[in-house]
Amino acid sequence: MRIDIVTIFPTFFDVLDISLLGKARQTGRIALGVHDLRDHTHDRHRTVDDTPYGGGAGMVMKPGPWGEALDGVLDGAEDPVVIFPSPAGEPFTQAMARELAGEQHLVFGCGRYEGIDQRVFDDAASHARVRLVSLGDYVLNGGEVATMAMIEAVGRLIPGVVGNPESLVQESHGDGLLEYPSYTKPAEWRGRAVPPVLLSGNHGAIAAWRREQSVARTERVRPDLLP
């Protein structure tokens, strides 16, 4: 998969050089390009924002630098998906992460200030599939944190990135439920014992217990996930 990021803070994404995603880059499973939006400005202050038409608080990101940056990233690209993190977008879910993991090319546009000029979205939609995506019902200072979260959620679903594919099925949201509680050695710690069923060696009973715990946790914490 090819991933491109347009941002005014390119060093923010240096963390993608480490951990599983860093290894995925080293092995060629993920190719990453980070592009500084300010490289596409033409004034000595490298200005990327201006006051909003119609008045109002804050600044809006100018279409010019965005247009040039996206033109460069999308030139020659085959059927890319351009994602703009936005609290006004569709909610990001595990199902969307699985969908995006099947794409060949993702482009993330990290907005700041009061957002990006609407014409940038409209123009990009004439070259690519554009999606505004919300990480949750809250507002961040910019799109970088949301982009990082989405890249990690998507990247780990690419075949070969996570060592044991079975772990992707068993974790929270893998089957529409929250994950069951996990335990490791020692069998007793500070007077708290591991549930006996997990020590029984009875795989059928263990599977049933885990399913029961997943359903109970989902009912308690996220009842909206249940049918």
Curated annotation (Swiss-Prot):
Cross-referenced InterPro entries: Alpha/beta_knot_MTases, tRNA_m1G_MeTrfase_C_sf, tRNA_m1G_MeTrfase_TrmD, tRNA_m1G_MTases_N, tRNA_MeTrfase_TRMD/TRM10
Pfam families, per database record: tRNA_m1G_MT (PF01746)
GO MF term list: tRNA (guanine(37)-N1)-methyltransferase activity
Keywords for this protein: Cytoplasm, Methyltransferase, S-adenosyl-L-methionine, Transferase, tRNA processing
Annotated EC: 2.1.1.228
Positions contributing to S-adenosyl-L-methionine binding: G111, L135, G136, D137, Y138, V139, L140
GO CC annotation terms, alphabetical: cytosol
HAMAP family: TrmD
Assembly mode: Homodimer.
Family: Belongs to the RNA methyltransferase TrmD family.
Function: Specifically methylates guanosine-37 in various tRNAs.
Record-given protein name: tRNA (guanine-N(1)-)-methyltransferase
Source organism (scientific name): Leifsonia xyli subsp. xyli (strain CTCB07)
Gene designation per UniProt: trmD
